Amino acid sequence: MTQKHGKKYTAALAKVEAEKNYALNDAVALVKEIDYANFDASVEVAFKLNVDTRQADQQLRGAVVLPNGTGKDKKVIVFAQGDKAKEAEAAGADVVGAADLVAQIQGGWMDFDTAIATPDMMAQVGRVARILGPKGMMPNPKTGTVTMDVAKAVSDAKGGQVTYRTDRDGNVAVPVGRVSFEEGKLAENIKTIADTVLKARPAAVKGTYVQHVSIASTFGPAVALDLNTL
């Protein structure tokens, strides 16, 4: 079934040259120009990778701190006890707990964006894995959210850390800021995540690794990027 778009989207799409791969700075300027949302829309970069995600060693997952943040104030929870709980609180975690926090989530509470845990808490956190997992919020060592250094993890999460992972088709989509960001700051964030994805190239991948990359605002059309400008 063909998706129908409204007049505003169609007008925005008309300003994007089909089949053209834009230089990064030009693409950022265009995405800002054609955005028509009546709020400060998010900007996302999307990669299409030549990876076989059926193979464990070709599944990308990780985290990176964007130099200019995401423009979103993240609510961070930490599963920790004792001194580590105190460290998390001092670092600015919104909620810190142990079995009580697990019980809250089991009861349906999900008012947070990032969950962090110390390794010793993972047995308890596992009781809510079926709730957190599908939402991509389960603490994981690969994203730095299972750690003894809870202060750094909280600081990173609050300071603009984003996580990335391939879906089953080899796509990676990551928020890189807001339409209101200065063009240079958006471009710097995009370069940061692009460098991270490029460095994460699995050794088993043959031929072209990044097949396509584009950026778009929440409701706006995608603008293809020239990889050579990243």
Swiss-Prot record:
<dbReference type="InterPro" id="IPR005878">
    <property type="entry name" value="Ribosom_uL1_bac-type"/>
</dbReference>
<dbReference type="InterPro" id="IPR002143">
    <property type="entry name" value="Ribosomal_uL1"/>
</dbReference>
<dbReference type="GO" id="GO:0006412">
    <property type="term" value="P:translation"/>
</dbReference>
<dbReference type="GO" id="GO:0015934">
    <property type="term" value="C:large ribosomal subunit"/>
</dbReference>
<keyword id="KW-0689">Ribosomal protein</keyword>
<dbReference type="GO" id="GO:0003735">
    <property type="term" value="F:structural constituent of ribosome"/>
</dbReference>
<comment type="subunit">
    <text>Part of the 50S ribosomal subunit.</text>
</comment>
<dbReference type="Pfam" id="PF00687">
    <property type="entry name" value="Ribosomal_L1"/>
</dbReference>
<dbReference type="InterPro" id="IPR023674">
    <property type="entry name" value="Ribosomal_uL1-like"/>
</dbReference>
<comment type="function">
    <text>Protein L1 is also a translational repressor protein, it controls the translation of the L11 operon by binding to its mRNA.</text>
</comment>
<keyword id="KW-0687">Ribonucleoprotein</keyword>
<dbReference type="GO" id="GO:0000049">
    <property type="term" value="F:tRNA binding"/>
</dbReference>
<dbReference type="InterPro" id="IPR016095">
    <property type="entry name" value="Ribosomal_uL1_3-a/b-sand"/>
</dbReference>
<dbReference type="InterPro" id="IPR023673">
    <property type="entry name" value="Ribosomal_uL1_CS"/>
</dbReference>
<dbReference type="GO" id="GO:0006417">
    <property type="term" value="P:regulation of translation"/>
</dbReference>
<keyword id="KW-0810">Translation regulation</keyword>
<dbReference type="InterPro" id="IPR028364">
    <property type="entry name" value="Ribosomal_uL1/biogenesis"/>
</dbReference>
<keyword id="KW-0694">RNA-binding</keyword>
<comment type="similarity">
    <text>Belongs to the universal ribosomal protein uL1 family.</text>
</comment>
<dbReference type="GO" id="GO:0019843">
    <property type="term" value="F:rRNA binding"/>
</dbReference>
<keyword id="KW-0699">rRNA-binding</keyword>
<protein>
    <recommendedName>
        <fullName>Large ribosomal subunit protein uL1</fullName>
    </recommendedName>
</protein>
<keyword id="KW-0678">Repressor</keyword>
<comment type="function">
    <text>Binds directly to 23S rRNA. The L1 stalk is quite mobile in the ribosome, and is involved in E site tRNA release.</text>
</comment>
<keyword id="KW-0820">tRNA-binding</keyword>
